[in-house]
UniProtKB/Swiss-Prot annotation:
<keyword id="KW-0597">Phosphoprotein</keyword>
<dbReference type="Pfam" id="PF23565">
    <property type="entry name" value="ARM_TANGO6"/>
</dbReference>
<comment type="similarity">
    <text>Belongs to the Tango6 family.</text>
</comment>
<feature type="region of interest" description="Disordered">
    <location>
        <begin position="777"/>
        <end position="834"/>
    </location>
</feature>
<keyword id="KW-0677">Repeat</keyword>
<dbReference type="InterPro" id="IPR039600">
    <property type="entry name" value="TANGO6/Rtp1"/>
</dbReference>
<dbReference type="Pfam" id="PF25267">
    <property type="entry name" value="TANGO6_N"/>
</dbReference>
<feature type="compositionally biased region" description="Basic and acidic residues">
    <location>
        <begin position="777"/>
        <end position="795"/>
    </location>
</feature>
<dbReference type="InterPro" id="IPR016024">
    <property type="entry name" value="ARM-type_fold"/>
</dbReference>
<feature type="modified residue" description="Phosphoserine">
    <location>
        <position position="556"/>
    </location>
</feature>
<dbReference type="Pfam" id="PF10304">
    <property type="entry name" value="RTP1_C2"/>
</dbReference>
<feature type="transmembrane region" description="Helical">
    <location>
        <begin position="468"/>
        <end position="488"/>
    </location>
</feature>
<protein>
    <recommendedName>
        <fullName>Transport and Golgi organization protein 6 homolog</fullName>
    </recommendedName>
</protein>
<dbReference type="Pfam" id="PF10363">
    <property type="entry name" value="RTP1_C1"/>
</dbReference>
<dbReference type="GO" id="GO:0009306">
    <property type="term" value="P:protein secretion"/>
</dbReference>
<dbReference type="InterPro" id="IPR019414">
    <property type="entry name" value="Rtp1_C2"/>
</dbReference>
<dbReference type="InterPro" id="IPR011989">
    <property type="entry name" value="ARM-like"/>
</dbReference>
Length: 1094
């Protein structure tokens, strides 16, 4: 025996990998053609082939001396093996010999690796790869091993699995069905012993790293199924089989341990996926009859897989393993593939995972412990950077967040919401800062923490879009900090600005209206009880472009003025940013409700002023009381100023659609009536107040006159105005308003059945005012700005608390001279109807410092030019001078009006005005500012469009000016010149022929060499306009340069770094493709000429 062991040891030293792999190939096929010949055999032919392969291998061992060492190694391993190797069943004999050769391969690879001693690398040739370990398998050798493993699993494991355990062999391949029929289950050894032997031998082979990766990557599921059956399948106690054919309890225990060791060893998502397959998963619809006939997994296996999956889940990083295990099979993560985008859209699968994660397994000691371990891993799913998996992981995390918040709100608040919102809670004015944190300059919240916090809140609240109570209540305390952060991001560029805005808009839209109004009061500073940023904390721009929260530096005496200025400007900016935020909340009605709240606050301000006048004399107060009184007075004045500032901003930012329902309009009118009554009580009635009151009552008249379809519920709301209207009718000094108030009371009380003439006249007067201003409102919209409306004007004029906002039912005329207003409201004037006095008044208004007056005057002059008014056209030089001077104005409404005027004037006298404009556009920066040149460029573009076919007359000066502008050092001017060049070329058609080469050379040079992105975009856009404008004529007009343009577009698509320029180039290529298709394959006209013979 000792001699045999010595020989065996020598065999291990001399036996090589090539010999073992050659033996394995011999077992696969006698012709060496791999497994292809076996896959086409049937039953008897397969058995004969297996016998032939076994005989050929034994002949090699007996007759070929070169195989002697391998034979000795195989015999040594066979002696150590504890399983029966010979059987009447050929399939088992084949499997047994294959397993022995795999064990020989493993032992040889271990021996070769142990004896390998690589030399030291040569420092002179560091680029040379290190020596390869002798136990490494080549690609072809790995394929051979994979074929062998497939046969071992197919013949040694799959046939012996119980129904419902694993995927049946006959449903995998046609060859698998053949194998299932040729296995002899009656021959020794028993099927259970065969399964145990195969699994144990394969796990032994898998101890080598290289071989283990080949086994587990492809056959983990089958081995796991076998170990589950061996270790956990209930045994029948009634009929005991012979001892050699029954697994002992020790072997079952070893099988259970091997299963758990294998699950811990492999890639965890792979383990999760295979366990789900073993468990059976949800029933799937399938038209395949074979698939429908598959047995369901037995109950013990389903329970076992559920237990093992729960163990995988509760391990470190178990959540990620479960998510990857379920999703990767469909294209996410490491698996990737063409189905990744399909999987990203499959939200149902992500939601199913979320339900699994939110359900506490039975193995957990308590839900508290489970969620304490799971929730941090769920939060980590939000922070994956891989674009392919990020969407799915975030969907799973968001849905888990929502599900847990719905089912276990107290645990969600403790383990999910508190960690997410912790950076914001840390800097609240209600939080207690430690002494170490109060050192000036200390970073309380880092840039990464704050960015991650805002992104997580956005994903949970806005993306999840579930207004659960626990979610709303958790976010309410930090809304003040969130709003201040939003205000800070508005001061500079920040990637979290849009996230903060979306979060605030979402929460304000989902909150109850009272809570939303309370939050807005806190944002504006009207409610000090709302939690906000700690007085010692401040936002600062971080080094990576984000935002961090730090402790303020101590303010010295010299910096007190600067600190006060910063405080005042920040408060003013906060109110303006609140107005911007509310401008997005008009459709839901929140902006209207907050506006009405501010109106009511104005009434309180008036009443507070009255009480202040009746205060006790200072002589009756102590010094402490006097100081407290002065503090309260200062706070009260600050609140009043804040309310006035809020009203001014809201009037400026809100559109006429601020009120979305009848209730809001009635509340607005009620607030106006209350304020009027309060003013009467204080004897402070004014003309502006009378106009405001008249307009608000006109609103009610419009609604009662049929502008709004009123229901019985609306009349119930309108009845709230009856006491106020009665008070106005009894106390207001103006008899017209008194009469209107009485008539409105009658109409409301009778539900509109009786309406006096005064009500109808008031409604018509209000609607006429709206029509009067309709044209100017359109001009305001085109300038993309909202100039201060009449409510703001009233507020500034009286400086006392009056306002009348625009609503969806009325709007007020701007304050401009009558001479300006009259011509603009007449659209059908005849030539000569404008008098000299009117013209002079409008010309004077064109120099008025008030922006609305000046803009209206410019629009009026433009209208007269468009109508060819003789008086206006006689002063063309004067008008041109006025328009050109106003081009340099900074207000959008003014200079856009001036641009329109110059364009209309040039349309009338192009030969006189166009040369001056071209000279001004072509001038240097010293003569005109870049902004003015850009505005002149806009004028030239409008002139080119207006001239149409007549533009050919001025082709030479226009095209030369634009080509020179492309060489200007200012990038914005170059882009403007290219835009104008595109408009011009689009309209020249065949007249472009003589300069087509110059234009093409210019575009190619700019698109390839210009350093500014906007200029390159403009050049490519010119090509798009050129092809789009010429359409089918492009093959004739651009015949000489079409190839150059095609090469340019391909160059941009392939090499241009800017995505917008690439998009323009792609659009141009599509235009060119359509042009050429229509040129080469013109559409067939299915028509036939019918000639009538004389």
């Amino acid at each position: 025996m000792a001699a045999r062991q010595a020989v065996g040891s020598g065999a291990q030293e001399t036996c090589g990998l090539d010999r073992i792999l050659e033996a394995l190939k011999l077992l696969l096929s006698p012709g060496g053609s791999g497994s292809s010949s076996l896959q086409v055999t049937k039953h008897d032919v397969l058995l004969a082939t297996l016998k032939s392969n076994l005989s050929a291998l034994e002949d090699k061992f007996l007759k070929d001396p070169q195989w002697k060492n391998l034979k000795l190694l195989r015999d040594e391993i066979a002696d150590k093996a504890e399983w029966p190797q010979n059987s009447v069943d050929v399939t088992w004999s084949f499997t047994s010999q294959t397993l022995l050769l795999l064990l020989c391969l493993k032992e040889t690879m271990i021996r070769l690796a142990a004896n390998f001693n690589p030399g030291k690398p040569n420092p002179r040739t560091p680029e040379v790869a290190p020596a390869l370990s002798p136990d490494a398998l080549s690609i072809s050798q790995q394929k051979t091993v994979q074929f062998v493993l497939q046969f071992v699993v197919t013949l040694g494991i799959c046939p012996y699995l119980m129904p419902g355990v694993g995927v049946p062999l006959r449903y995998r391949t046609e060859f698998g069905a053949v194998v299932q029929d040729v296995v002899c289950f009656d021959a020794a050894p028993d099927a259970t012993r065969r399964l145990y032997t195969s699994c144990k031998a394969l796990l032994n082979v898998a101890q080598h790293t290289s071989l283990g990766s080949l086994i587990f990557c492809h056959h983990f599921g089958d081995i796991a199924a076998g170990l589950c059956q061996l270790g956990f399948c209930p045994t029948k106690r009634k009929l005991l089989t012979p001892a050699e054919e029954v697994l002992t309890e020790e072997e079952r225990t070893l099988s259970r341990g091997a299963l758990r060791d294998m699950l811990d060893q492999v890639y965890q998502p792979l383990a999760v996926r295979e366990l789900l397959i073993l468990q059976g998963g949800p029933p799937q619809s399938c038209t395949d009859v074979k698939t429908q006939m598959r047995c369901r997994a037995p109950a013990w296996l389903r329970r076992l897989c559920g237990q093992l999956l729960s163990e995988r889940l509760m391990r470190p990083n178990g959540v990620q393993a479960v998510v990857r295990g379920i999703l990767e099979g469909a294209g996410a993560g490491a698996a990737g593939g063409s189905d990744a985008e399909v999987t990203a859209a499959d939200w149902k699968k992500c939601d199913l995972i979320a339900k699994i994660l939110a359900s506490c397994p039975q193995q957990s000691l308590s839900p508290e412990n489970y969620y304490r371990d799971i929730c941090p891993q769920v939060l980590d799913l939000f922070h994956f950077q891989d674009k392919l998996t990020a969407r799915q992981f975030q969907r799973v995390a968001t849905t888990t967040f929502i599900t847990l918040s719905r089912e276990r709100p107290h645990l969600a608040a403790k383990y999910l919401l508190q960690p997410v919102l912790a950076p914001l809670h840390r800097c609240l004015n209600t939080a207690e800062l430690s002494e170490s944190d109060m050192v000036p300059g200390t970073i309380l919240v880092t840039e990464e923490e704050l960015s991650r916090c805002i992104e997580d809140v956005f994903k949970v609240y806005v993306v999840g879009n579930e207004p659960l109570t626990v979610l709303m209540d958790s976010l309410l305390p930090v809304l003040g900090v969130l709003f201040l952060l939003y205000c800070f991001t508005k001061q500079s560029v920040s990637h979290i600005r849009s996230l903060c805005q979306e979060i605030l808009l979402w929460i304000l839209g989902k909150l109850e209206r009272k809570k939303a109004i309370a939050s807005l009061k806190g944002f504006a500073g009207l409610d000090k009880a709302v939690p906000s940023l700690h007085s010692l904390c401040q936002f600062r721009v971080a080094t990576q472009g984000g935002i961090m929260i730090t402790i303020k530096e101590a303010i010295s005496d010299e910096d007190e003025d600067e600190a006060l200025y910063q405080k005042v400007s920040s408060e003013q900016g906060r109110v303006e940013h609140l107005g911007d935020l509310l401008s997005h909340c008009q459709e839901c009605g929140l902006a209207g409700d907050f506006f009405i709240f501010c109106l009511k606050e104005l009434t309180h301000v008036a009443s507070e002023n009255e009480t202040e006048l009746k205060t006790e004399p200072f002589s009756s107060k102590s010094l402490l009381e006097l100081e407290q009184h002065q503090t309260l007075l200062v706070e009260g004045q600050e609140r009043k100023l804040l309310v006035l500032q809020l009203m001014a901003v809201l009037c400026e930012r809100m559109s006429e659609q601020i009120f979305t329902n009848v209730t809001q309009v009635v509340d607005f009118v009620a607030a106006t009536l209350q304020r009027a009554c309060a003013s009467l009580a204080h004897q402070a009635e004014s003309t502006v107040e009378s106009q405001t009151l008249s307009m608000s009552m006109g609103l009610v008249a419009v609604m009662l006159g049929g502008a709004v379809q009123l229901k019985s519920s609306d009349f119930a709301v309108l009845k709230q105005l009856l006491p106020l209207l009665e008070k106005v009718s009894n106390t207001y000094p103006d008899p017209v308003i008194q009469e209107l108030a009485v008539d409105l009371r009658i109409t409301i009380s009778t539900h509109g059945a009786f309406a006096t003439e005064a009500v109808s006249m008031a409604a018509q007067s209000t609607l006429n005012r709206k029509d009067l201003e309709g044209k100017i409102e359109e001009q305001q919209q085109t300038s993309h700005e909202r100039p201060t409306d009449v409510a703001h004007s009233h507020l500034e004029q009286q400086q006392s608390h009056e306002t009348a906002p625009q609503t969806g039912l009325q709007s007020n005329a701007p304050i401009i001279p009558q001479g300006v207003n009259e011509p603009s409201t007449t659209t059908s004037q005849k030539s000569g109807s404008v008098t000299t006095e009117q013209l002079q008044e409008v010309l004077l208004s064109a120099y008025d410092p008030q922006i609305p007056t000046r803009a209206a005057a410019l629009r009026t002059l433009s209208h007269w030019i468009e109508q060819r008014e003789a008086k206006a056209l006689e002063m063309q030089e004067k008008l041109l001078k006025i328009f050109l001077e106003n081009l340099e104005h900074e207000d959008t409404f003014v200079y856009l009006s001036a641009i329109q005027g110059v364009a209309l004037l040039s349309d009338v006298y192009p030969e006189k005005i166009l040369p001056d404009l071209l000279a001004q556009y072509d001038s240097s920066k010293d003569k005109h500012t870049p902004e003015t040149r850009m505005k002149v460029g806009e004028v030239l573009m409008r002139i080119v469009r207006a001239l149409g076919d007549m533009v050919s007359k001025y082709r030479e000066p226009l095209i030369h000016t634009f080509l020179r502008g492309v060489r200007d050092p200012d990038g914005a001017h170059r882009a403007s010149s290219l835009a104008n060049l595109g408009e011009l070329c689009q309209r020249l058609d065949f007249l472009l022929g003589s300069v087509v080469h110059e234009v093409t050379a210019c575009l190619i040079a700019v698109a390839k060499t210009d350093g500014e992105v906007q200029v390159r975009r403009a050049a490519i856009h010119v090509v798009v306009l050129l092809l789009r404008g010429l359409s089918q004529k492009a093959t004739e007009v651009l015949s000489a340069v079409l190839k150059d343009l095609y090469h340019l577009l391909k160059h941009v698509v392939c090499l241009e770094p800017d995505d917008v320029a690439k998009l323009h180039a792609q659009l141009a290529l599509e235009e060119l493709d359509d042009i050429m298709k229509n040129f080469l394959f013109p559409p067939q006209k299915l028509e036939k000429k019918i000639m009538v013979l004389p």
